Amino acid sequence: MIAGEGSGGVAVLPLGVAYDGLLALGLVLEEMATSGRRLAELVSGFPRLFMRKRELPCPPSLVYRVLERFRRHHAGDAPDCADGVRLSWDDAWLHVRASGTEPLLRIIAEAPAQERAEALVDKAAAFARRITSGHEGS
């Protein structure tokens, strides 16, 4: 099993976690060697997806109020609340969470079209701004 994150962290079980690109590079080279395929051939098998990220300043006193209101607003979308609020659809996902290091919300979306990813982030940011500005209507 392989897991990764945007900051470059890669975990390969049972090997562990590495925070540089050498492990990922080694895995790609190993796949190229064992499959006999070029990098372009490997990449062509992956779907083209667009990711958009936004950081939204949010006072620590309001972060969890925003997340709770967002979760309630999207209750029909079966939110995953293990780390903030994550919504998943067939074609896209959206994740809103508190930063662990700064007074802000991190909003991330991924979709097969750039416009869809941007729209998801824009809508979540607007929702959060209404709460942080005191205009809580959803």
Residue ranges of each PLM-predicted region?
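Phosphate-binding and adjacent anionic-ligand microenvironments
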Residues: 1-138
